[in-house]
Amino acid sequence: MLAGVFCFEACDAAPRPTPDAAVRPDDVGPPERDVPFDVPPPRAFGPGFTDLTLPLERDAPFVIPAASREMFSTDELSPLVGDVDGDGRDELVVSHWPTDDSIVRGMPAPYAVYRYDRAARQFVRVAGARLPEMPPLAGILDLDGDGRDDLIALERSRALAWGEGAGFSQPAPLDARPSDWMMSSRILSYFLDDLDDDGWLDLLVATDCCRTPCTDLHALLRTGPRTFDERPDLLTIPQVSKPYAAFSARFAPGERVLMSVGWSCVDPNSAPVFYRSGAPDAAGYPRFAAFDPTPPRSYFRGEQLGFPTIAFNSPMAACADDLDDDGRLDLAVALNPVHQLFRGTAAWPFEDVTAAAGVPTTSADSGRAMIPWSMAFVDLDRDTRLDWIIAHGNDQTAWSDPPERFIGPQFVGAYQNVGGMRFADVTTALHLERRGQWRTLTLEDWDDDGDADLAVGGQQELPRLYRNDIDNGAHGVVLRLRGTTSNHLGVGAWLTVWISEGGRPLRRYVGGSAHPYVVHEPFVTVGLGGATRIARLRVAWPSGTVQELRDLAADRAHTITEPPSLVITPPSRHAPADGRSAVTVLVTPRDPAGALRADARVDVALAGTGTLAGPAVRGPEGWTARVVASPGPGTAVVTVRIDGVALAVHPRLWWD
């Protein structure tokens, strides 16, 4: 293993912009941008968030060096949530990335496992919990759709351990073939999305790319139940970067956009951050090219028109959701030190609303602007509006700042949505103001009461664990999706919620947060205000299936399963390349209630190798088509049309 694989920020080929070199609140934009607006006082929040970290502090599971100025590197401690023992209940795993070179030398990263005790309303250590020896963990989530959580780590050669029974398989590499992986440094982030619209979740991997030749953004397409294939040909990358996070979503103009959320060690003035999808290639795979959807007059540029690029301000995380319920994704990007906010538009570019939002930066006790890292949109107070939560902390450059520029301890900022895409700082009212250096966010519903609880990971100290005890008379629900024809986590689905029939609907997006170092299974929180039930819920699945449910009770979690409209047999989608073997395609058109639509018209088409053995035939469960394998290796893409409208997923078949 190369010594540079786990080199930290101080090893960069070029210095990152310091807070003074980055855009500052007092030199951004015309003066009228920073005129404060009248913000209604926040509601009484009751206890706010309750800190549950004491058991971890008493347990002291790790030896953590004390924080000090001019640190060469820092310990990262990340809270992760998932079922590590196969009992159907989630555990909390604290993953420790030490400052020493033990990880570089191939030693496994330490961890500690806890469980939330609902009776005691506190976390307790899980005695005897054992995980495979792996590098620092990035996530505990179901990667292959078999219902069992898997492990994914921040190092390519031992990245994946598949959940099996009450344990895990031996760690395996992401993909053994890419030649440029050895020239890339450590993995910094993962993002899950169906990049090629085949109904399977793929991996977008961000790596520390400060030593060319290397690639900063890796697209790994799923090619089987537990296999991924890197496709470097899908992205045209003109300038490599050091992304702290990777992101993917389909925005209102209809294009899927990938983000390499970072700056370039080579030239931060020219590094692209955004890539949009274009026409697919002859084999049906997507292609992505760099572009800039930011408006020329963006907050982060100050008075300069169209320059610098957003990469100059060191992007570190991103989140997207529909803040104004207009059916378009809005986007926030963590910059140094700006909380950059864009409103989604029908056509590029975005609209910059950073100043109007009211919280372009937040100051530490030193008076200097803090550095934002992870961020998320979530309805913390269940008032039906999406709030904004942002973790702030040092990067390596900030640790070595001279005393007159040192930011000092920072904190997690909580910003209440007061309407009109405006936000008010309610950090102290929610009791989230503990000082430290924070980088990662983990949202979870520890107690299954329908609101978002919080874990914050940082540097040189244990994560902070918080239970949402906001008491303002409002109610909410947590919604988790399980896709069948769509990807199994429902990433990319849109939810429309009617609290009352005929009322104004709320819109929520599934899978809109990208963090450094950690990846989580997505879920959605919906605040209902004073209502105790959802009158109607509409799920627009990535497959194109539209499902409706009614009368969902508040103050609990619900799991919504997609009625399957397309089933491939065998589920591996692989068959021998012998000219005889067949794959079966079952199409079941659904009405919004999930029932079979017997009056539908179904057509199945095939592109690539293999042969479609006649039109789809009607049966009791729907329409069935047979695809006969080609006599030689190859692939084919299935397109299904229902009443002339193509499903949005196109499964790929493999002949081996």
What are these regions (language model features)?
Residues 96-108, 208-214, 262-270, 391-409:
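Short, conserved, GDST-rich strand-edge loop motifs in beta-rich repeat architectures
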Residues 563-656:
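The feature marks long extracellular or luminal low-complexity segments
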Residues 58-101:
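Beta-strand-rich domains and repeat architectures in extracellular enzymes and scaffolds
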Residues 86-96, 145-154, 197-206, 253-262, ...:
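Acidic/hydrophobic-patterned starts of short beta strands in beta-sheet-rich repeat architectures
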Residues 7-44, 59:
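Ser/Thr-rich, Pro/Gly/Ala-heavy low-complexity intrinsically disordered linkers and tails
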Residues 422, 428-438, 442-565:
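Gly/Ser/Thr/Pro-enriched helix-cap/hinge segments flanking short amphipathic alpha-helices
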Residues 75-86, 135-145, 186-197, 243-257, ...:
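Beta-propeller blade termini
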Residues 37-74, 112-134, 151, 162-185, ...:
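Blade-edge motifs of beta-propeller repeat domains
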